[in-house]
Amino acid sequence: MRLPSLLSFLFASTTLAALPYKGVDWSSLLIEEKAGKTYKNSAGTVQPLETILKSSGVNTVRQRIWVNPSDANYNLDYNIKLAKRAKAAGLKIYLDFHYSDNWADPGKQVTPAAWKSLAKDALVKQVYDYTKSVMGTFQSNGISLDIVSIGNEITPGLLFPVGKLGSGEGAANVAALLKSASRAIKESSISPKPKIMIHLDNGWKWDTQMWWYDTVLATGALSLADFDMQGVSYYPFYNAAATLAAFGTSVANMAKKYGKEVVVAETNWPSYCPNPSTAFPADTKSIPISVDGQVQWMKEVAKRVTAVGGGKGTGVFYWEPAWIDNAGLGSSCGWNLMFGDDGKVMSSLAVFNSI
């Protein structure tokens, strides 16, 4: 093979390996700006966050949506305002339904206050109506969505107590609720149709992922045709068993067994963590707790996602790299952001140009 041909081949191979979805969660942006925060590029020039993200290689932004939050933060209007900025910047949008008035995660999946009295069938209909309405609002505002997650980290279920796994009809109810959400998206006015994601935590635990999908799919109320993506959260600072090796095995197994795209919906790495509450996984010990370490971590995670068979590993999302007022991002580490407290971007954000 002649050198130009070899170089062309190598370039093509590299291009093919790039992730289709290289993203960050930027949900907190409007709150931060209201508090007076500004963002600066590497030269120290103030720019809109979306401009800095785009120039750093980010192509998709993730946004959480809550049903009726008491302060209106993360509600539908908030998300439309934020999404308009993403669209103007040429960024794709991944909308993350929490189906709650506040945070929904493995520790809590609280049914919205206005829905609390609904029995199962009425709740299933409410999820359909709400989801379809949200899709219609995005469509009427001329905003397309690339990904929609029907629930956030729903490993224990969603919309408790009706959709709580491990309780009576829990699995069948979870399946019915998710089926309803999926059908609402497919039957909504939004066009083109977004990819539908189911998102669980602990992406490194293959046995948990398999148990969840096998349990819910076995009810017959939800089928593989109802979703396109399996999203996972994968953090290094909550469990020493969360090794890169375990993560790589888990996502590979997921794609092989279920045939869906696999996406890391959330991840972080700290640049400062003097007193972690949990030991970091053994095979991450060579990655420094630093800005350079953030780059190494993202490359290691992306490498395992792109290695998933059949090109099924399609995305990695860094959770809230610009939330200056919440630098620990819920962990025991002091700084997980990719921006300094002065709003200046750290060099680590540019890793999105190389994954």
Label the predicted regions:
Residues 49-50, 187, 193-195, 210-283, ...:
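Glycoside hydrolase catalytic-domain groove-lining segments
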Residues 19-92, 98-127, 231, 237:
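N-terminal substrate-binding region of glycoside hydrolase catalytic domains
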Residues 34-40, 44-45, 253, 272-355:
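Aromatic-rich peripheral "rim/lid" segments of glycoside hydrolase catalytic domains that contact
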Residues 76-77, 105-217, 225, 240-249, ...:
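Active-site cleft segment of glycoside hydrolase catalytic domains centered on the general acid/base Glu
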Residues 1-18:
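Fungal secretory targeting signals
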Residues 24, 53, 96, 148, ...:
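Conserved, mostly hydrophobic/aromatic
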Residues 36-54, 79, 127-137, 206-220, ...:
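Short, acidic/polar
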Residues 26-29, 66-68, 98-100, 150-155, ...:
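Active-site beta-loop-alpha junctions enriched in small/polar residues
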